[in-house]
Amino acid sequence: TKIAVIGQAFPYIPIANPSWMFPEYSFGIRDENMSAMVAEVRAAGAECVVVLSHNGFDVDKKMASVVPGIDVILSGHTHDALPEPYVVGETIVIASGSNGKFVSRVDLDIRDARMIGYRTKLIPIFSDVIEPDKEVSALIDQQRAPYQAELSEVIGQTDSLLYRRGNFNGTWDDLICDALLSERDAEIALSPGVRWGPSMLPGQDITREDIYNVTSMTYGEAYRSEMTGHMLNVILEDVADNIFNPDPYYQQGGDMVRTGGLGYTIDVTKPQGERISNLTLLKTGELIDPAKAYVVAGWASVNEGTDGPQIWDVVENHIKKQGTVSVSGNNSVEVIGA
């Protein structure tokens, strides 16, 4: 059986990342290109077409409804882990999670260039019961050896569960925002709603590598600037639309921008421009004044020429001063309509 595998890059790379870093490349949702590619591989004799996609789960579901001839979409980017495939017409969409937590097994029954049946299984990975490959382990150890002492240095400890995922906040992000507020002497902190980075359990040592695992970006400068209340509202509205726009093709994936020192209410059922209300400066309890300027610290700006220390150094310095970090529950965001 001839199987064609088509790669689909993340379509929003120039928006979600600094476009000035890759000016010679172009990205986007281009259903006509995908349709042409499917037709091309089918004409070349492919009996099964698999798309290896970084679109995100919702975008892949819509693409499956628009582009004919795809049998399987192996969906990435949004880190969803689903025990059963999502079926769109004659296409199955499979989401297998992230960080090596699962591997999906897919058995297909292909006859006369048609998928007439399938079996799938989402298999959890328990690393402590799988014997590592000795040759690969040795190669990894060799590559890490020059950096091992730096990576394994203990910076502090956590009393709290540190996790990334959450539509509006996560304790890792709360800790990063706390670091931005204190180390950059700011009233408000903004941190991107990225989904990567493993969790840490209460009582664990925090090593430098643990910090790198949740902050490593090629544009990690921690800026400090002034923003008006109006601009803060615009930013929150813009990010919210990337997540809650009813059309998946306008969703970039990821979670809501994390905020430190700033509370707000969001109604996810409203249209863009009407979702965010009750912006509040938490240290005073006062509503944000649209015309007033506030000192804001953040990182991962897509703007060229951003100035500031690297975010991993900011977080490391904060944790060193704390010794043991404790992150309490975050109730600064009120969600309506979810």
Predicted regions and their residues:
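Acidic, metal/ion-coordinating pockets
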Residues: 1-131, 135-137, 167-179, 243, ...
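Catalytic centers of hydrolytic enzymes
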Residues: 22, 97-338
